[in-house]
């Protein structure tokens, strides 16, 4: 049986935690930042966890994570 390919875009976006979850970065913090408030940018800064509903998709994209 052939090896399953990892989705390379997903491998760059998600990191697996020790407890089995996945860390992710928030969107909307790359450009056009002048119109966004400091509070909004500050809250987008820390990493977040992938939600339970999306976890299956991430696991399927990263078979060896």
Swiss-Prot record:
Cellular component per GO?
cytosolic large ribosomal subunit
Annotated coiled-coil positions are: none
* The entry's keywords: Ribonucleoprotein, Ribosomal protein
Cross-referenced Pfam families: Ribosomal_L35p
> Which molecular-function annotation in GO is an example for this chain?
structural constituent of ribosome
Its GO biological process annotations read: translation
At the top level of its lineage, which domain of life is listed? Bacteria
Homology family: Belongs to the bacterial ribosomal protein bL35 family.
- HAMAP family xref list: Ribosomal_bL35
Q: What is this protein called?
A: Large ribosomal subunit protein bL35
Task: Say which species the protein is native to.
Answer: Sodalis glossinidius (strain morsitans)
């Amino acid at each position: 049986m052939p090896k399953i390919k990892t989705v390379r875009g997903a491998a760059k976006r998600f990191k697996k935690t020790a407890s089995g979850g996945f860390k992710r970065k928030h969107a909307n913090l790359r450009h056009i930042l002048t119109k966004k408030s400091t509070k909004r940018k500050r809250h987008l800064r820390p990493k977040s966890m992938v939600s339970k509903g999306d976890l299956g998709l991430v696991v399927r994209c990263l078979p060896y994570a």
